Amino acid sequence: MNIFNQLKQDIIVASKQLYNNQAIANTATIDIPKDSFNGDLSSNVAMIIAAKESIAPREVALKFKEVLITLPYIASIEIAGPGFINFTIKADSWQASIKDILQHEEKFFEIDIDKSRNINIEYVSANPTGPMHIGHARGAVYGDVLARILQKVSYSVTKEYYVNDAGSQINDLVSTVLLRYKEALGEQITIPAGLYPGEYLIPLGQILAKEYGNKLLTMNYDERFKIIKSFAVEKMLDLNRKDLADLGIKHDIFFSEQSLHDKGEIEETVKLLESMGLIYEGTLPAPKGKIHEEWDNRVQKLFKSTKYGDSQDRPIEKADGSWSYFASDLAYAKDKIERGANHLIYVLGADHSGYVKRIEAIVKALGKEQVKVDVKICQLVNFVENGVPVKMSKRLGSFASVQDVNNEVGKDIIRFMMLTRQNDKPLDFDLVKVKEQSRENPIFYVQYAHVRTISILSKARELMPESYNNFESGKYDLSLLSSEEEIEIIKLLVSWTKTLEASAKYFEPHRIAFYLINLASKFHSMWNFGKENSEYRFVIESNKELTLARLALASAIQKVIASGLEVIGVEPMNKM
């Protein structure tokens, strides 16, 4: 029995019995109180029902208490504050949870959540102009782990990468590759400022020279541009795919911006919005701080973005008459919705924080308020090595790429460390710290806890084979896990599903990293206490019954840590 799930179901049943309203009760929360004197679990159901029924919350809470106190796993119920219902759970119910984790793991960790949501999550979407730098890693890991979490709680999820292959930076890429091609043919070249001087484009020039000789130089501009662009973009995408794969990240779809232009999808989207009365010709006010004479006050086609909460309407055409990047965004959102997505999630870098309102406006308009949209911003990573910041710029030709850092510390460290702060807070990534074997290094601390649980089970198998066989057969008395420390860690184990659910609900993967660090800390404390007090050790040869119970506890800890690490795409270590 998962106590969180069971209590939620019993509250819903009680709500139907008392107020014939189980739908509202389903929105109630069940949380772990910050202060232990408020019980083990707390619910706000009384206040939700009271608001609907126009009754005093404490009166509602008292009625719930009368019904719920009869449940076999409830020790006591107290009403607190404006109407919170605080529950104390019987110790044997907590203890029994260990057996459920070990014998019914899949069912125990099952989360009953709305499965009608079809989520499209777009993340990374780095310009295909070179190797991915470490600044992209945070959004890549955040988006990938969030997608894994959403899939874990049974949502349908499409992981998408938007390939920006129609902008000015692609033109710069083509110009640079053309120069590298000429260089491969023996010409002396200079890479002008604004292009890409990195050596990673030299092989592309060599490949083109080998395949075409000097034929590209005899072609007209458009023909040559098309060949080099197609070749260079695909090679850079291959590079990005490999960088992502080495981080354990695989997208379902790589969607080309250029395809929106080629298939006329932008024109279709504009016509649709015109039919909805959302496109008009007008002028925009000058940006703050601009001298009026410097502002191009031309009449242009605008999307009524302000109707949906944006700060200003958005132009869909550039001064030369070509479609704006915003027009591509409109068509891209329409394409996602037409493919069946009813919830769009965009993961953007800190430099795109100004895009939040305009993206929300796009989806609200095209989704006709029926499609959900969330835009999540990942703040900067302060990447340092021995306290010295690493410069990150493709244009400078020397930067810390994802591959550089992956080669240095490995994907698991990168993935875990990118989750050690909330996504909208800056993150310090220190290469020295992440390789330390100390409690100050969170990934080591969590992995070491997993290794120690494996060690406990191995030691018991070696020293007490008969007892270990009994443990594997489920012959253990969990009532022996009665110390305050043991009950507290059992409560934490049971709350794993709650953490996973909250991570999915609030789009906060860092909650899982925080949970694992907390669980590892409590486990290490128990381990260290046993080193000083032999009666608290996990394996006690003179006390087989207690050893069996603690083997069950150690095994449950191992399973939960492994489950948490697997959700965030980190491989649990069995030895160090």
UniProtKB/Swiss-Prot annotation:
InterPro entries: aa-tRNA-synth_I_CS, Arg-tRNA-ligase, Arg-tRNA-synth_N, Arg-tRNA-synth_N_sf, ArgRS_core, DALR_anticod-bd, Rossmann-like_a/b/a_fold, tRNAsynth_Ia_anticodon-bd. GO terms for molecular function: arginine-tRNA ligase activity; ATP binding. The keyword Membrane does not apply. GO terms for biological process: arginyl-tRNA aminoacylation. It is an enzyme of class 6 (ligase). It catalyses: tRNA(Arg) + L-arginine + ATP = L-arginyl-tRNA(Arg) + AMP + diphosphate. Its EC number is 6.1.1.19. Keywords: Aminoacyl-tRNA synthetase, ATP-binding, Cytoplasm, Ligase, Nucleotide-binding, Protein biosynthesis. It is found in: Cytoplasm. A motif ('HIGH' region) lies at residues 126-136. It holds the Pfam family tRNA-synt_1d. NCBIfam families: argS (TIGR00456). Belongs to the class-I aminoacyl-tRNA synthetase family. Monomer. This is Arginine--tRNA ligase. It comes from Rickettsia rickettsii (strain Sheila Smith).
